[in-house]
Amino acid sequence: MMTNLFSVFDPSAIFNLSLNWLSTFLGLLMIPSIYWLMPSRYNIVWNSILLTLHKEFKTLLGPSGHNGSTFIFISLFSLILFNNFMGLFPYIFTSTSHLTLTLSLALPLWLCFMLYGWINHTQHMFAHLVPQGTPAVLMPFMVCIETISNIIRPGTLAVRLTANMIAGHLLLTLLGNTGPSMSYLLVTFLLTAQIALLVLESAVAMIQSYVFAVLSTLYSSEVN
């Protein structure tokens, strides 16, 4: 039994070299190969997914969105999805379960949106602080509420992704630790439950990467 359930998320070192975070960038070695190799079925399916995301993000950004602005969110989706799936494999470091990575993705994006909006569309940003139809008495409270909700956006983005990744891995760890003390019959049910949970975690990995990218797109559309 582990002394600490969260030890599965601890970075480990090989020959005193911390190579865990390098797994985050393995996608950069695999994805570019589609540009000089014959496209496989995997490449065709992946390109169709990216095209669908491009159309959806373009709709969310609206007509005022700049050309090519969807590609940053598609890249964000691809990076998070790849690392979420990599973390499901045994003995591979789960980088998206650390706020170090998720907050470093969410905070610079939000900060860029805020700087761009307040510098170029100041009146538009002030108008967002008071929703349409708000009574005059409630306007000061709405300004405070909208300001707080705006400030905590990068934190909620980062914590949502991290918490979902940690929760699933902890459940798999808890179930796995009970295996040695079970009979063969119960181990069969345990393996079935773990496989079902692994399928659920795969769905969560896709959903959370999509949610992160869509919310980032919506936040950027508010400053245009």
Curated annotation (Swiss-Prot):
Pfam families: ATP-synt_A. Changing V137I: In strain: BG1. The lineage of its organism: Eukaryota, Metazoa, Ecdysozoa, Arthropoda, Hexapoda. One of its GO terms (molecular function) is proton-transporting ATP synthase activity, rotational mechanism. Keywords: ATP synthesis, CF(0), Hydrogen ion transport, Ion transport, Membrane, Mitochondrion, Mitochondrion inner membrane, Transmembrane, Transmembrane helix, Transport. F-type ATPases have 2 components, CF(1) - the catalytic core - and CF(0) - the membrane proton channel. CF(1) has five subunits: alpha(3), beta(3), gamma(1), delta(1), epsilon(1). CF(0) has three main subunits: a, b and c. This is ATP synthase subunit a. The chain crosses the membrane at residues 17-37, 72-92, 99-119, 125-145, 170-190, 195-215. It comes from the Eukaryota. One of its GO terms (cellular component) is mitochondrial inner membrane. The keyword Mitochondrion applies. It is found in: Mitochondrion inner membrane. Its main location: mitochondrion. InterPro entries: ATP_synth_F0_asu (IPR000568), ATP_synth_F0_asu_AS (IPR023011), ATP_synth_F0_asu_bact/mt (IPR045083), F0_ATP_A_sf (IPR035908). Mitochondrial membrane ATP synthase (F(1)F(0) ATP synthase or Complex V) produces ATP from ADP in the presence of a proton gradient across the membrane which is generated by electron transport complexes of the respiratory chain. F-type ATPases consist of two structural domains, F(1) - containing the extramembraneous catalytic core and F(0) - containing the membrane proton channel, linked together by a central stalk and a peripheral stalk. During catalysis, ATP synthesis in the catalytic domain of F(1) is coupled via a rotary mechanism of the central stalk subunits to proton translocation. The keyword Lipoprotein does not apply. It is a multi-pass membrane protein. Belongs to the ATPase A chain family.
